[in-house]
Amino acid sequence: MSLRALPLCLATLLAGCAIFTETYGIQDVDNWAAKNEPLAESGKMKWSEFYAQYLERVANTPVISQGPVVERLGIMVTASLFYERGRVDKAGFDSVRGIVQKYQTIDDPAANLLARNALVKALDQSAASKPDR
């Protein structure tokens, strides 16, 4: 092997290690979510706690493009807190959650816009259904 090929070999090796680390990190987060989401669905864990921990795990995982995912989980933390505090009903929360689940594998800011719009709509509907105080 020539000395010219050595840097290329090292770069390839490091890239392979980085890809493995990223893949392992993503799989670890996905496994955690699959294990804990049923706890939130059954009421054994608050939705806000689930999404806050999910957000923390994603933020601490070395992933190349995690920006839209972090934003989407932030939207879900907000939506779940509104739901738990009665500012959004179950149908509204499920609407936001459904959009997030549908687009969870797409790193697209447009998916986040849909989730934010669903949350705003749920808040508006909730406010309209409550009598003035």
Locations of regions flagged by a protein language model:
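Acidic, Ser/Pro/Thr-rich low-complexity regulatory regions
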Residues: 18-133
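Sec-dependent bacterial lipoprotein signal peptides
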Residues: 1-19
